[in-house]
Each structure stands twice: as structure tokens, then as C-alpha cells.
């Protein structure tokens, strides 16, 4: 950065010396009144997201066991999906919805999950290694730790929860939260009745609220 005239946040134009423009003394702030930016700026989650092939070949389309090679079309939908989930976690009405399941959500030992901390636990996960599931083996999702993957339909049709694809999404997030199939956080009302239903019913209010934005369903690079 060089000495020069700069417009401040208040609108004034001031001259700053090169010393005053030292990058170490500056911070970045983005200001925008666009509704999309307003929504995503409210997201508290700091998930570090990677896209992984897990041995699948995205060029030839050859799967490796239960994994297809994820392609850019799926990565874009994953960004949309996790922006929506991150924003959903900030909504008071989602917390209220989750709280109604106190005593219904059970952990791996069949003890009640504290619903008052569930959303913050999800927000505080470190992130996800996102892959694409090959459904030819009868598998629609895999999750646990940082690993999170769903079949193609969940990436393309999460906007309407078509065929219960959102249940798969939140089932695998239940695994990422540390729950196994002995809990009700995978097979149970967390993924089938609470989070999936709320996502579908409130999609119009989310940052990426329609499949027509990315138009992935007509993308020639889907499987």
C-alpha cells in the first residue's frame, strides 16, 4: 500500500502516509446492504471445508468403493448447502424447534441430548471433508469426524428435500457430531422430522434459496 488519498468508511477523503498504510495495522471489513451478504455475515460457524475424492476419479467417473470423484458442480452445491445450514443455525425459530425435541433426542447411551447446546455444538465443529457418495452399492451417505459425504441427489435436491435427501444430509451431520445408530441423532427425529423439515419449510429465507440459482440439475457434468 502506498501514500495517497483514500475514502474512509464515513465518506471523507483523507491522505495517509505510507507508514500509516502498513498492512500490519490494517484490518479488512466488508460493508454491503445486499440481502445475501446480510444473511451470510450472520453465520457464526467457522467450518474449514475441503473437497476430497477418496479415490474416486472425477474425469472418468470411475468410483472407488463407496466414493465417486466429486466434481465442481457438486462443490458449488455443497457451498450453497453449508451456507444455508450455517445461516439456519443462527435463527431463533430453529433453536425453538430443536428445543421441542428435548427428551426425544437420545445419545449413544440412550440418555437425553441437551438440545440447548446442540446447535452451538454443530456450529463449533472444525469443518468437513466433503465427498460424493457412489450410490451403486446401496449407500446414500457416510459421515463421522470430519468426513461427510452424500449421494448426488442430496446435492441437487436439498432445496425441496426430494425423496428425503435432506434426511441423509442431517443423518451424516449427526455422525459428525459423534452419534452412532444407537442414538436418535442419525436414524431418528433429528434427521427425519426436525432439521430436515425445518430446512425444507424455511428454504425461501436462506441465502441460497432455489435450485434455479446454480442450475446444477441441468449441468452436463453431473453423473
Label for each model-derived stretch:
Residues 1-166, 176-223:
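Predominantly extracellular/secreted Zn2+-dependent metalloproteases
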Amino acid at each position: 500500500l502506498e501514500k495517497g488519498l483514500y475514502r474512509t468508511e464515513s465518506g471523507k477523503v483523507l491522505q495517509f502516509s505510507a507508514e500509516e498504510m502498513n498492512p500490519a495495522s490494517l484490518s479488512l471489513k466488508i460493508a454491503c446492504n445486499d440481502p445475501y451478504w446480510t444473511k451470510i455475515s450472520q453465520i457464526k460457524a467457522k467450518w474449514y471445508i475441503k473437497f476430497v475424492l477418496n479415490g474416486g476419479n472425477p474425469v472418468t467417473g470411475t468410483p472407488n468403493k463407496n466414493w465417486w470423484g466429486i466434481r465442481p458442480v457438486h462443490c458449488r452445491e455443497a457451498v450453497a448447502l453449508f451456507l444455508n445450514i450455517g445461516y439456519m443455525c443462527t435463527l431463533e425459530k430453529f433453536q425453538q424447534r430443536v428445543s421441542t425435541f428435548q427428551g426425544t433426542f437420545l445419545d449413544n447411551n440412550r440418555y437425553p441430548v441437551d438440545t440447548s447446546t446442540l446447535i452451538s455444538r454443530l456450529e463449533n465443529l472444525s469443518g468437513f471433508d466433503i465427498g460424493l457418495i457412489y450410490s451403486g452399492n446401496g449407500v446414500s451417505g457416510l459421515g463421522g469426524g470430519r468426513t461427510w459425504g452424500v449421494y448426488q441427489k442430496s446435492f441437487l435436491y436439498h432445496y425441496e428435500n426430494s425423496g428425503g435427501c435432506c434426511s441423509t444430509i442431517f443423518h451424516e451431520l449427526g455422525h459428525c457430531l459423534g452419534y452412532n445408530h444407537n442414538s436418535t441423532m442419525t436414524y431418528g427425529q433429528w434427521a427425519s422430522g426436525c432439521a430436515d423439515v425445518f430446512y425444507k419449510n424455511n428454504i425461501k429465507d436462506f441465502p441460497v434459496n432455489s435450485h434455479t440459482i446454480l442450475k446444477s440439475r441441468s449441468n452436463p457434468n453431473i453423473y
